[in-house]
Amino acid sequence: MDIEQPSINVINSLYQISGVEVGQHFYLQIGNFQVHAQVLITSWVVIAILLGLSIVATRDLQTIPTGSQNFIEYVLEFIRDLTRTQIGEEEYRPWVPFIGTMFLFIFVSNWSGALFPWRIIQLPHGELAAPTNDINTTVALALLTSVAYFYAGLHKRGLSYFGKYIQPTPVLLPINILEDFTKPLSLSFRLFGNILADELVVAVLISLVPLVVPIPMMFLGLFTSAIQALIFATLAAAYIGESMEGHH
């Protein structure tokens, strides 16, 4: 009996791991459109958190900031410095809201996957997770970044923007065009892969061992999640700055 009990425990653990599914989705039919409800729900939760924090922090502004206002101003200063460093002193100001929105949405989304008990909410299909755990979200963010740096380049340089594709020699035209396609791909898959892998590792560890053991991994996940948000925002700002400068 003593020999059989550990074997049963191992089998149960393996069965729980096999239940960790990837790619199961819950859809809602809205008119003629099929909506990915999991991403929609968690994204709106993240947006509500950001709006709530903004309202609380700015409802009673003081000349000398204290408490939550001080924290918000520190975050905004960090985003402003990041944008200015990558885009440049003269052109950075209009892009602070865009880069800030990207950074804060990704940051809160990533942390929500580690801190929120999404999986206790039962759905007919699949399960809730961080918005950035889904490739649809990360691709959308990357495409927004692509639109932003195309707009920045065309707005600043006009049609001469397209001259970059034949610099320093027309032979590099295919490679330069391909580069514009690989930028959003690298942004989206890097963010998606890291967040998905982190959540899967934690889910497997919780299935195998007691709750206390995965805690260090969860803290590591929080750190890497913050780094991924910073990397995405930094690269987005760098691409925008590069498109306005006119060289690689």
Swiss-Prot record:
- Describe its assembly: F-type ATPases have 2 components, CF(1) - the catalytic core - and CF(0) - the membrane proton channel. CF(1) has five subunits: alpha(3), beta(3), gamma(1), delta(1), epsilon(1). CF(0) has four main subunits: a, b, b' and c.
Example of a GO cellular component annotation carried by this entry? proton-transporting ATP synthase complex
Question: Pfam families given for it?
Answer: ATP-synt_A
Q: What is its main location?
A: plastid
Family statement = Belongs to the ATPase A chain family.
Protein's name in the database: ATP synthase subunit a, chloroplastic
Location in or out of the cell:
Plastid, Chloroplast thylakoid membrane
SUPFAM superfamilies (UniProt xref) = F1F0 ATP synthase subunit A
Q: Which InterPro entries match?
A: ATP_syn_F0_a_bact/chloroplast, ATP_synth_F0_asu, ATP_synth_F0_asu_AS, F0_ATP_A_sf
